[in-house]
Amino acid sequence: MVDWVEAMKTKLTPPWGTSDSQSHGISRRTALKLAMGMAGVTAAGAATPAVAAAPGKDPRRAATKRYKMKKSINLWAFPYPDRMNLRECLQLAKDAGFEGIELNYDLESDLSPKSKTKEFTAIRKMADKIGIAISGLCSFLFWPYPLTSNDPKERARGMELAGLMTQAAHDLGTDNLLVVPGAVHMPWREDHDPTPNDICDKRARAAIGKLLPKAEKLNVHLNIENIFFNGYLMTPQEMIDFVDSFDSAHVQVHFDTGNIMLFQFPEHWIRQLGKRIRNVHLKEFTKKGTDHSLESFRPLLDGTTNWPAVIDAFETTGYDGYLTFEYFHPYPHYPEALIHQTSDSLDRMLGRLA
């Protein structure tokens, strides 16, 4: 068995989740706790209503232009399931002023292979009753079960899980499924046998091609995420070539601002990807004193991302969908503070403060 505790301490850790608890002996939440360095931070203020007055004129307070994009947050920012249940997380997101929440498919949670259409439909109805949209479905399971693995059993399990996620997304009432199409390497997995670039590309294209018919039938978009740390689809043009090769409206891009910040710039990618961007992860990143681990990702606005340029780039492409904050360190004390703080930050970024 791989010593994942030591691996998380010394290796580059994935900025989108951790390994499968059953196959590697450590839960997602436990692994993420190893990277937690943030103590409770007080909220920046009460959430601003989703529909606000015209933006103010002081650029020190907030954007002076109103943007159409919608506010969303990923479930990983909540202390779920340790200290809050799913209903409480949805309600907190709604109360904080978010219009949507992105859920995560796991092996041991309310959203797992153990749940079927009945259970997922109940979650959708619960979200509807609370008044919050499910902006998308995400999963860390593409790492223990990569679609391009040299191990046929891992590939087969990955395809099986991706198919289940597609059905789950449909049942949850969202048409957005984040997909990691493959990996040349995974620095955080010492047991991963690197896949040659050409073979990785061939397998990734074959995998998405096999998943596509079901996705089209269920009207679920397979949104390909830019990872960078996996050594695959490293430039905007590579992503464009990959997505366009399927000639399907159901293969789009899930763009992550933070994953490329170490060496590149999200505002450059956005303008090139254009209308292909279907969904977005806002991950704040800092280049100051980073150890290239999960600690590189910070609370929103506490990093080195040029957010005015990024938001302007999204507007230039016509994007008006969800901006989902993704963060892996629920505050150990008063976790609601992070949620309200993030909502306030997004209000300022989107010009929702008068």
Q: Which residue ranges define each predicted feature?
A:
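N-terminal secretory signal peptides
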Residues: 1-26
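N-terminal twin-arginine translocation
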Residues: 25-30, 41-59
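Active-site acidic/histidine proton-transfer and metal-coordination neighborhood
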Residues: 34-46, 60-66, 85-90, 124-133, ...
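Acidic/histidine-rich catalytic cores of soluble enzymes
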Residues: 68-70, 100-101, 137, 205-304, ...
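Conserved, mostly hydrophobic/aromatic
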Residues: 73, 93, 101, 127, ...
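Active-site beta-loop-alpha junctions enriched in small/polar residues
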Residues: 76-78, 104-106, 139-142, 182, ...
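Catalytic domains of carbohydrate-active enzymes, especially glycoside hydrolases
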Residues: 88-106
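Glycine-rich, proline-tolerant flexible connector loops at the mouths of alpha/beta enzymes
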Residues: 104-124, 181-184
